[in-house]
Amino acid sequence: MKLDLKILDARMRDYMPAYATTGSAGLDLRACLDAPVTLQPGETTLVPTGLAIHLADPGYAALILPRSGLGHKHGIVLGNLVGLIDSDYQGQLMVSTWNRGQTEFVLNPFERLAQLVIVPVVQAQFNIVDDFAQSERGEGGFGSTGRH
């Protein structure tokens, strides 16, 4: 898949989104910062990537997801948990960065911060019904299928 990418900050030419391995599902996104940013515990900030994408095809969307190492080791996750980039969005990719950890975290310029995953999208149309055909599960939720 070819994806239109707009470089908003010339420094990002040296830090293009890339797959870390041939089996990677996510492209690494980096913090486009002029200086380090310190996030205190509980603090959230929007971090620019210096990049914009335009998917154009309504059959696709992009997800901005946290990097597992930052979340597990440092408590750095996304403030909105998942960022959804619609196919018609053309603005800068921003990463809502939340320090849910117990200590301050310093985010350095061009550090890998999140990952971008391209996913297929199906736009649903609704069929209004009075009742559903009976299923084995029915309305059971929130643990109704058991713990183990």
From Swiss-Prot:
Signal peptide: none annotated. It comes from the Bacteria. Its cofactor is Mg(2+). Substrate binds at residues 67-69, 80, 84-86, 94. GO terms for biological process: dUMP biosynthetic process; dUTP catabolic process. Pathway: Pyrimidine metabolism; dUMP biosynthesis; dUMP from dCTP (dUTP route): step 2/2. Keywords: Hydrolase, Magnesium, Metal-binding, Nucleotide metabolism. It catalyses: dUTP + H2O = dUMP + diphosphate + H(+). The keyword Metal-binding applies. Its EC number is 3.6.1.23. InterPro entries: dUTPase (IPR008181), dUTPase-like (IPR029054), dUTPase-like_sf (IPR036157), dUTPase_trimeric (IPR033704). One of its GO terms (molecular function) is magnesium ion binding. This enzyme is involved in nucleotide metabolism: it produces dUMP, the immediate precursor of thymidine nucleotides and it decreases the intracellular concentration of dUTP so that uracil cannot be incorporated into DNA. NCBIfam families: dut, PRK00601.1. Belongs to the dUTPase family. This is Deoxyuridine 5'-triphosphate nucleotidohydrolase. It comes from Burkholderia ambifaria (strain MC40-6).
